[in-house]
Amino acid sequence: MPKLRSATSTEGRNMAGARALWRATGVKDNDFGKPIIAIANSFTQFVPGHVHLKDMGSLVASAIEEAGGIAKEFNTIAVDDGIAMGHGGMLYSLPSRELIADSVEYMVNAHCADALVCISNCDKITPGMLMAALRLNIPVVFVSGGPMEAGKTKLSDKLIKLDLVDAMVAAADSSVSDEDSAKIERSACPTCGSCSGMFTANSMNCLTEALGLSLPGNGSMLATHSDRRELFLEAGRRVMALTKRYYEQDDTSALPRNIACFKAFENATALDIAMGGSSNTVLHLLAAAQEAEVAFTMDDIDRMSRLVPHLCKVAPSTPKYHMEDVHRAGGVMGILGELDRAGLLHTDVPHVAADAGGNLKSVLAKYDVMQTQDDNVKQFFMAGPAGIPTTKAFSQDCRWPSLDDDRREGCIRSREFAFSQEGGLAVLSGNLAENGCIVKTAGVDESNLIFVGSARVYESQDDAVAGILGGEVVAGDVVVIRYEGPKGGPGMQEMLYPTSYLKSRGLGKACALITDGRFSGGTSGLSIGHVSPEAAAGGTIALIENGDRIEIDIPARSIKLAVSDAELAGRRETMLARGPMAWKPVGRERFVSMALKAYAMLATSADKGAVRDRSKLED
């Protein structure tokens, strides 16, 4: 049987000092020998998705201690991408993922914790904790803070649903009055929780369900609903059950690397494509797979993107549905159920919601609203919004009058009635992106699936914003924003402002945008990111010139710079002749701190998940 990791610091005469310190944290004589469960919280008053998490660790701890464990909580940092957006703060967002992963590893290994509960919610926090959990490979359960309620307001006597992106677009649209813009701003983010659409935070929290590492409802149950309390309590109970299975029964199926196996990554990708998740999820799934030592790559994502239909359309791809509507339709388990019936899901994989010996098939039998016989489960998925602004968790217990089980015209569709037979994400490749790039097809208008235009090149997001707002960009342009990749930014900024401003100027369907940076989960339109190799790594995107013809063909999965090989070779020679200034932006003024320079030294391009280049760290 595996020995408790915590025994290293709690057993033997030579650990008297460590035990004395444990006692000072509240550990009693009869507690020694119990498993120590780390609770990685991410409470902060900076982030609406985390502002309500302060007491969540205590909830989880109470369940752990009742089940016979010792619970010890610590905190990680959490960056709000929306607040950091549009200025130098965004350089820190993606690098914070690595810091979060490292900080969880540091705390868990320094104190020899036996298992882990991750309380996450927003964009880089869930991926960072996921990377750490798979790196550590000790029993783990994820439980997030939950989504925000959708905003609602009246404009021209019409009630509309809103989210963060609506506020940004309205503010940049000169046709929207100051009064209406302010009204939208005040209504867009009414409660605590992760932003209400299928943006990065909610996408990742949904994916933890598909990976098998969080409980049903984790990705969709509203932060404000009282039913979410039970998810935190059950996370504590479940992690103790997993801990006992591993340490007392030598059941390695309780470990995260055996749960989040290759098949589980395929399941998560199928879900991602079916629900039109944020393109950032590709980055984070690739990074998590490397930590899990699973050989899951962009090629696998490309392969699956050609097989999986688009079954669930949510804001920002449509104003009709938000996460509260996804939950009413059955949440992640509802989408997985449709994927299973379409023959696109592995159900023989372990899941933290399954009892010992169980698997995803048994979880779906209970939690898929289209097949369950459990009325409590149906009531669970009828939990709805209250429409009352608040920063408090569990502050309401409203319910929808009925489930949305309309698989023909509802929020979640069956394969037969899919929003499209093409999935919500696609991998494109060609001479402009030899190692691939990503487009969220769920947000692309059908008229733009094939697009040919002239390059309008910018060396930074700031210059692109100035060009768009200043009228340089016109219909038919392909806006190219380069040197914003993991190494070149550094930090791979999100390009939500450029895409929002294109929309506000009426160019959302008339232009394309290509970048080696990334996009907010709130982005829609013909926005192609993660171009690899990035400009700073010698990618072709660095060689594009104004006026070059760029050809995009999403159905054919291709992206081409219509310049001859000989011309490109000549441009590459010219670039290399710049010596130390080769593959660096011309004329860009940007302060890059030592912390960001350290990140850039080890960063890989997006096709590798923008993780550290391990070859530079090997002995």
From Swiss-Prot:
Catalytic residues in the record: 520
Cofactor stoichiometry and binding remark: Binds 1 [2Fe-2S] cluster per subunit. This cluster acts as a Lewis acid cofactor.
Keyword hit for Iron-sulfur: yes
Positions contributing to Mg(2+) binding: 81, 123-124, 494
A family per Pfam: ILVD_EDD_N
Location of N6-carboxylysine modifications: 124
Pathway: Amino-acid biosynthesis; L-isoleucine biosynthesis; L-isoleucine from 2-oxobutanoate: step 3/4; Amino-acid biosynthesis; L-valine biosynthesis; L-valine from pyruvate: step 3/4
One of the record's GO molecular function terms: dihydroxy-acid dehydratase activity
SUPFAM superfamilies named among the record's database cross-references: IlvD/EDD N-terminal domain-like (SSF143975), LeuD/IlvD-like (SSF52016)
Binding-site residues for [2Fe-2S] cluster, renumbered to this chain: 122, 195
Gene3D superfamilies according to UniProt: IlvD/EDD C-terminal domain-like
Subunit and partners: Homodimer.
UniProt function note: Functions in the biosynthesis of branched-chain amino acids. Catalyzes the dehydration of (2R,3R)-2,3-dihydroxy-3-methylpentanoate (2,3-dihydroxy-3-methylvalerate) into 2-oxo-3-methylpentanoate (2-oxo-3-methylvalerate) and of (2R)-2,3-dihydroxy-3-methylbutanoate (2,3-dihydroxyisovalerate) into 2-oxo-3-methylbutanoate (2-oxoisovalerate), the penultimate precursor to L-isoleucine and L-valine, respectively.
Protein name: Dihydroxy-acid dehydratase
Natural source organism: Shewanella oneidensis (strain ATCC 700550 / JCM 31522 / CIP 106686 / LMG 19005 / NCIMB 14063 / MR-1)
